[in-house]
Amino acid sequence: MKTEVAKIENVKRDWYLVDAQEMVLGRLASQIANILRGKNKAIYTPSVDTGDFVIVVNAEKIALTGRKLADKSYYSHSGFPGGLKEISAGKLLEKKPEELIKRAVKGMLPKNKLSRHMLKKLKIYAGSSHPHDAQQPKVLAL
């Protein structure tokens, strides 16, 4: 008997709802990355995107341990000389809390073409409401 390889047309995708309130960023991001990859499914295949959709609410209430709010920095570059931008995790949490979770999850996904497709299945909202009620997401307690 041969091992069955997952095909993209046979993958059934579920929607999960995660409440990020008072959850630690790194622990939450690693569990979300596993769901986006599909590692929680029996049909997981590394070369096929078998993951599910994840909706994260209350991103503004996420917790960081230690002094990471002040000490952890995120960098971006415009491509021009002297165009290096730096922002601390605390300021990023105030301005764009969705970006903080997105960057953490992106760093835990594989660095290949599939990671862009996996990241598109992640929906993050700062508040407690989301527009995905029609998909009937299952509440996931992490």
Swiss-Prot record:
<dbReference type="GO" id="GO:0006412">
    <property type="term" value="P:translation"/>
</dbReference>
<dbReference type="GO" id="GO:0003729">
    <property type="term" value="F:mRNA binding"/>
</dbReference>
<dbReference type="InterPro" id="IPR005823">
    <property type="entry name" value="Ribosomal_uL13_bac-type"/>
</dbReference>
<keyword id="KW-0687">Ribonucleoprotein</keyword>
<keyword id="KW-0689">Ribosomal protein</keyword>
<dbReference type="InterPro" id="IPR023563">
    <property type="entry name" value="Ribosomal_uL13_CS"/>
</dbReference>
<dbReference type="GO" id="GO:0017148">
    <property type="term" value="P:negative regulation of translation"/>
</dbReference>
<dbReference type="Pfam" id="PF00572">
    <property type="entry name" value="Ribosomal_L13"/>
</dbReference>
<comment type="function">
    <text>This protein is one of the early assembly proteins of the 50S ribosomal subunit, although it is not seen to bind rRNA by itself. It is important during the early stages of 50S assembly.</text>
</comment>
<dbReference type="GO" id="GO:0022625">
    <property type="term" value="C:cytosolic large ribosomal subunit"/>
</dbReference>
<dbReference type="InterPro" id="IPR036899">
    <property type="entry name" value="Ribosomal_uL13_sf"/>
</dbReference>
<comment type="subunit">
    <text>Part of the 50S ribosomal subunit.</text>
</comment>
<dbReference type="GO" id="GO:0003735">
    <property type="term" value="F:structural constituent of ribosome"/>
</dbReference>
<protein>
    <recommendedName>
        <fullName>Large ribosomal subunit protein uL13</fullName>
    </recommendedName>
</protein>
<dbReference type="InterPro" id="IPR005822">
    <property type="entry name" value="Ribosomal_uL13"/>
</dbReference>
<comment type="similarity">
    <text>Belongs to the universal ribosomal protein uL13 family.</text>
</comment>
